[in-house]
């Protein structure tokens, strides 16, 4: 029987491989309690039985758990820095075929933005971006490549006009030439192996939800995944302290 939040964390780890101990407890517990109430369950035990036996409800749980906030060209000033300083420097040091990893890529907005920015500097055939997330639903959406107009609100027109096809009044579909630049795969930052010899790792606005110990462990693994002289690109509110 799942009696309390401690039992619930153990149950979720066994069922999904997601370790809730790595997330800030007050924040995560509040989100989970809200989800349980929304699904009209009386407590942890009832909800655990439901997600164990209902694949759709389990998918909803994982999707809700892995906080997905993403849009194209989010925080334009940072993208400008990437475009004008970081990428040219990496290309100068390592050549045009950079190994890039978009970690916790959500619905694909970030790796596709990377591909479009990089396409101004190197041939499309030389662009290969490895993109991972723990959530199957967002990965499927990323592979589909269809986005709302709101997701593209910060994207410069030069990219929108060149790489998107409008679908009705509200949606846009990304071009196949950009889709081919990105390889999506399911991966858990807390337990799965990391790609090695990366020139650039992008992981933005994700680790703010993790405990300090979990963040430290992930940053160490990121460091081990980078080549000497490589770059870790994080969100504008995130700090890495040695």
Residue ranges and their predicted role:
Residues 95-110, 127-130:
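Conserved class I S-adenosyl-L-methionine
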Residues 107-124:
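Conserved SAM-binding loop of SAM-dependent methyltransferases across substrates and taxa
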Residues 216-228:
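A short glycine-rich, Lys/Arg-flanked "PGG" loop and its adjoining helix->strand segment in the class I
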């Amino acid at each position: 029987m799942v009696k309390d939040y401690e039992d619930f964390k153990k149950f979720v780890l066994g069922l999904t491989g997601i370790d809730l101990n790595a997330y800030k407890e007050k924040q995560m517990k509040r989100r989970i309690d809200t989800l349980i109430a929304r699904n009209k369950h009386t407590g942890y035990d009832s909800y655990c039985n439901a997600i164990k036996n209902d694949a759709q409800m389990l998918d909803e749980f994982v999707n809700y758990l892995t906080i997905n906030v993403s849009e194209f060209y989010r925080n334009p000033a940072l993208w400008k820095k990437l475009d004008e300083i970081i990428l040219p420097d990496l290309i100068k040091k390592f050549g045009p075929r950079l190994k890039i990893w978009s970690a916790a890529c959500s619905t694909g907005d970030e790796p596709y933005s990377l591909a479009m920015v990089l396409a101004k500097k190197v041939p499309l055939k030389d662009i290969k971006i490895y993109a991972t997330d723990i959530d199957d639903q967002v990965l499927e959406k990323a592979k589909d490549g269809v986005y709302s107009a709101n997701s593209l609100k910060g994207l410069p027109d030069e990219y929108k006009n060149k790489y998107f096809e409008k679908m009705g009044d509200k949606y846009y579909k990304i071009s196949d030439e950009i889709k081919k630049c990105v390889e999506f795969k399911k991966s858990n930052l807390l337990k799965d192996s990391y790609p090695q010899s990366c020139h650039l790792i992008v992981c933005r606005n994700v680790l703010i939800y993790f405990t300090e110990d979990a963040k430290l462990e992930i940053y160490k693994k990121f460091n081990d995944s980078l080549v000497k002289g490589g770059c870790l690109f994080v969100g504008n509110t995130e700090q890495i302290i040695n």
